[in-house]
Amino acid sequence: MTRAAHSTEPEDLPEAIVIPPASSTPVRAVLLDADGVLQLIGTPWGEALTRGGGPAFAQAMIDGETDALAGRETLTELLERVVKDLGLELRASDLLEMWHRATPDPLAWQLVRDLREAGYTTVLATNQQWERRAWMREQLGYDGLCDIDGYSCTLGVAKPDAAYFQRLLELAGVEADQALFVDDSATNIAAAREVGLRTIHHPADAGGELLRREVAQALTLAASPSRG
């Protein structure tokens, strides 16, 4: 696969924020969101959609995205339908470029590698349409980063549906309380907690240095006998 010129090797790793070994905690799997966590997106989605097609377009895309995220239709099909319904003089192929934006965070990717080295099963837990999944794999180089790829379009269900989390737990071979889920969406975090997962609500685009501290702290707390 062809990769774009995005370096995923950190130039300067923050010193000595140690990841506890998996053997020292009850956590066996770490599930990480992509947008806002492993990759930086800059302009929030709602704002970007509004800029690209107007407020009505943005709302229609948000309201109608479920089937595309669950892989039951393509993003192109959704865009074509919304453009037609709203009578917009825009081309779906041009609008599709809005989904071709994200910059991998080298420090976040290094955290994934360190988690794997420490014995955790790492899971890419991300809502994506078929087209953006292909772009992330081919241009950003996501294949092989995590042990398990949990793209919603391939699973047939998307966050915040409980079935999405249950499917990832099955793939990872762990119980809910053995999994730590990191996401920038409060809705997704609440849904994961309902299923019983441990969670970290990471601020969108806050960067890999903070992410590393959050994950290390959560794993250390999980290892404490006084937890809960």
What would you call each of these model-derived segments?
Residues 40, 124-126, 201:
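Hydrophobic residues in well-ordered beta-strands that form the structural core
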Residues 3-66, 70, 81, 85-88, ...:
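Active-site neighborhood of HAD-like aspartate-dependent phosphohydrolases
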Residues 2-32, 129-228:
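Asp-based, Mg2+/Mn2+-dependent phosphohydrolase catalytic module
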Residues 88-89, 222:
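Membrane-interface interhelical linkers
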Residues 93-123, 162:
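Short, acidic loop-to-helix structural element flanking the phosphoryl-transfer center
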Residues 46, 108-113, 189, 212:
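Short amphipathic alpha-helical segments and helix-helix/interface helices
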Residues 72-76:
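A structural motif shared across PLP-dependent enzymes of the aminotransferase-like
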